[in-house]
């Protein structure tokens, strides 16, 4: 059975079409009108080995906030839908990723209980036209609609582009680990019997 989802979300602020294949090859087709986010989603797909297609249009003439946050929302919802009842998944995942002078870590639990711990101190700057404070908004939208507990930690580093890139790569690798099927797991990885 394919673990995939296709979601379309239309609001007065954004129009987003997204498809996700969890058991993919890391292929991506991304067009969000936010070039830096395109880059982050492309490497997210590649390092998580997810096949991901995103087409988004938003009120970027105002700023990128709604578009970035809403893509996080839709991506989280796609993971939730694709995982279904979560039978057989490992549930937990973690990754520590270096990017030159940066080291970032992510630990995740696909528990159904959304919670974001975001220990990433970034200066209030832009990478191109992209406000780096939107990285948190993206991940908050993601966890809220995926039902994931995500701990994102910057251990050290200076270059803001490298920091954000390491965070997205670590998140992808942790989610790849957590979504893996394990033949030894009967039902769900919980003593409650439900996630």
From Swiss-Prot:
PROSITE patterns recorded: IGP_DEHYDRATASE_1 (PS00954), IGP_DEHYDRATASE_2 (PS00955)
Gene Ontology CC: cytoplasm
Pfam family, one: IGPD
Protein name: Imidazoleglycerol-phosphate dehydratase
E.C. numbers: 4.2.1.19
Keyword Cytoplasm attributed: yes
HAMAP family reported in the protein's UniProt record: HisB
Coiled coil: none
Location(s), subcellular: Cytoplasm
GO biological process: L-histidine biosynthetic process
Family: Belongs to the imidazoleglycerol-phosphate dehydratase family.
Keyword set, alphabetical order: Amino-acid biosynthesis, Cytoplasm, Histidine biosynthesis, Lyase
Catalysed reaction equations from the record: D-erythro-1-(imidazol-4-yl)glycerol 3-phosphate = 3-(imidazol-4-yl)-2-oxopropyl phosphate + H2O
């Amino acid at each position: 059975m394919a673990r995939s989802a296709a979601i379309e979300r239309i609001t007065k602020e954004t129009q987003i079409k997204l498809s996700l294949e969890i058991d993919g090859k890391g292929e991506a087709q991304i067009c969000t009108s936010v070039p830096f986010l395109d880059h982050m989603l492309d490497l997210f797909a590649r390092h998580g080995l997810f096949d991901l297609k995103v087409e988004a249009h938003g009120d970027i003439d105002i700023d990128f906030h709604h578009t970035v946050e809403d893509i996080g929302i839709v991506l989280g919802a796609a993971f939730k839908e694709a995982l279904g009842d979560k039978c057989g998944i490992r549930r937990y995942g973690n990754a520590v990723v270096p990017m030159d002078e940066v080291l970032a870590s992510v630990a995740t639990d696909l528990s159904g209980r959304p919670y974001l711990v975001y220990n990433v101190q970034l200066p209030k700057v832009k990478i191109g036209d992209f406000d780096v404070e939107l990285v948190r908004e993206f991940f908050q939208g993601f966890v809220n609609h995926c039902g994931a507990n995500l701990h994102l930690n910057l251990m050290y580093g200076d270059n803001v582009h490298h920091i954000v890139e390491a965070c997205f790569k670590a998140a992808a690798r942790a989610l790849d680990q957590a979504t893996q099927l394990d033949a030894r797991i009967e039902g769900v990885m919980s003593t409650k019997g439900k996630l």
